[in-house]
Each structure stands twice: as structure tokens, then as C-alpha cells.
């Protein structure tokens, strides 16, 4: 005798959701390369109840895929909520916390390294939700060029998120962007959302100006990228008001 679990009134296309949450407050420090966001993140993380800075590459990837229409809105919003909660959950017991001494995001660069060293030996897992409730920590995330594609963040986290955009004189950012193009574009260490253009692999931000991107040198690419990012950022600000 055989039967099917799929009945006549099943969901044909599921909506991805996450309604509950652990992180009550999230602060995101964002900006273009060379703007000084890591320095500001370190200062902000020294404030009361704010956790040490952590990079949020997963959230960046989700938002970029959504921007490229490669991920549906419900999935993008749910994943932003999942990643913020998961990061705080792990951090509250120093799981996946960076102990590499020289890194900018290292425990040893934090205002209170001992807090994270103690967590290694404390009880974890089941007690973490209650610890979060009692201590009310603020998750501190540092991101790269996120504001320009940040709709899933604002819609997913709503009034739980504080978004800080770091802006610097464009000359210094241009220098850093140019260096990135000279050193990182063909480097397999640069884990990025890329798009296919003919036989070429281009960064996601070259979308809709691929031919121009290919024809430019490193300095020109940096200028066009900065301009395009600023335009997208301003558009997002207007739409999210």
C-alpha cells in the first residue's frame, strides 16, 4: 500500500519567513573601500553593550543577489534575519569569534578582549537566549557597499537596525578602489558575487555597464564604480524614507 504526503491542498510555492528573533538591536557600519569604516566600527564597538565588530559578508551576498533579481524578496528578508540572529548567538559564546591576533576584527583588538575569552568557558547553547535577554547586547556589523543594495536589511530588521554610512573625501577612496582593482579582481581570495559576460567573470557592480567596465583601466573602473555606488545609495535612501 502506498500513499503520498502531498495532498490536494498543499502549498504550491512556500513563502520563506522568520518571525522570532534574538537580536534586539543591530548597528551596521557601512561604506565604500577606503572610507575608514573599520576604524569607526572599532570605536562604536567600545560603547556600552555593543559587541566587538564582525564582518557580515553573508548579508552582503544576500542583498547583492536580491539586487540582481536572483533571490526572491521573502527569502532575502528571512535570511537577513537568520544571519543577524545566528551571528549574535554564536558571538555570545565566542563560537566563530576571531582570535587571530593581527586581524582588525580580532578579539585582541576589541575594547574588552577578556569578555570573549571568558565566554569560551561559560555554558552555551540552551542558556544563550536568556543571556541575550538579560544582557541586551547590540550586534555590531561592518559591511562593504551594503547601503546601495540594502532593502532586505531595512525591511527585514525595521526599527531594530541602526545604519551608519561612513563618507570620506573621494580621493582616498579612489586610491583604495584602484589598488583593489589592481590586486584583487583576478585573485581567488576575493570571494564576491560575480556575473558572466561572454567568457569573462565580472563583479556584480559591473551589471548593466559590462562593456564599459571591460574597456576601462583600474583608475577608470574605480571612478565609475564609486559613481554608480553613490547613485544606487542615494536611490535606496529615497526609497527607504
Task: Describe these PLM feature segments.
Residues 56-141, 200-205:
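PAPS-dependent sulfation machinery
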Residues 1-13:
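N-terminal pre-Walker A segment at the start of P-loop NTPase domains
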Residues 35-51:
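A conserved segment at the C-terminal end of the G1
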Residues 29:
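Hydrophobic anchor at the beta1->P-loop junction of P-loop NTPases
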Residues 129, 133-134, 138, 144-241:
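PAPS-dependent sulfotransferase catalytic domain
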Residues 48-52, 160-163:
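Catalytic donor-sugar/metal-binding loop of nucleotide-sugar-dependent glycosyltransferases
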Residues 6, 49-54, 66:
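Extracellular glycan-modifying ectodomains
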Residues 17-24:
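Phosphate-binding P-loop
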Amino acid at each position: 500500500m502506498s500513499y503520498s504526503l502531498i495532498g490536494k491542498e498543499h502549498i504550491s510555492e512556500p513563502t520563506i519567513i522568520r518571525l522570532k528573533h534574538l537580536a534586539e538591536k543591530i548597528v551596521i557600519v557601512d561604506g565604500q573601500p577606503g572610507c575608514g569604516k573599520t576604524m569607526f566600527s572599532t570605536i562604536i564597538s567600545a560603547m556600552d553593550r555593543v559587541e566587538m565588530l564582525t564582518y557580515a559578508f553573508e548579508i552582503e551576498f544576500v542583498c547583492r543577489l536580491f539586487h540582481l533579481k536572483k533571490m526572491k524578496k521573502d527569502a532575502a528578508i528571512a535570511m537577513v534575519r537568520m544571519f543577524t540572529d545566528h551571528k549574535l548567538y554564536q558571538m555570545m559564546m565566542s563560537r566563530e569569534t576571531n582570535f587571530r591576533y593581527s586581524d582588525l576584527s580580532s578579539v585582541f583588538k576589541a575594547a574588552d578582549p577578556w569578555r570573549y575569552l571568558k565566554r569560551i568557558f561559560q555554558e552555551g547553547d540552551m542558556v544563550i537566549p536568556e543571556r541575550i535577554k538579560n544582557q541586551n547586547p547590540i550586534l555590531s556589523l561592518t559591511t562593504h557597499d551594503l547601503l546601495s543594495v540594502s532593502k532586505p536589511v531595512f525591511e527585514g530588521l525595521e526599527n531594530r537596525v541602526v545604519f551608519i554610512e561612513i563618507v570620506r573625501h573621494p580621493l582616498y577612496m579612489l586610491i583604495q578602489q584602484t589598488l583593489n582593482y589592481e590586486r584583487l579582481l583576478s585573485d581567488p581570495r576575493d570571494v564576491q558575487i560575480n556575473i558572466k559576460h561572454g567568457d569573462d567573470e565580472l563583479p556584480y557592480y559591473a551589471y548593466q555597464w559590462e562593456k564599459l567596465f571591460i574597456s576601462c583601466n583600474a583608475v577608470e573602473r574605480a571612478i565609475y564604480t564609486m559613481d554608480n555606488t553613490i547613485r544606487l545609495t542615494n536611490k535606496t535612501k529615497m526609497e527607504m524614507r
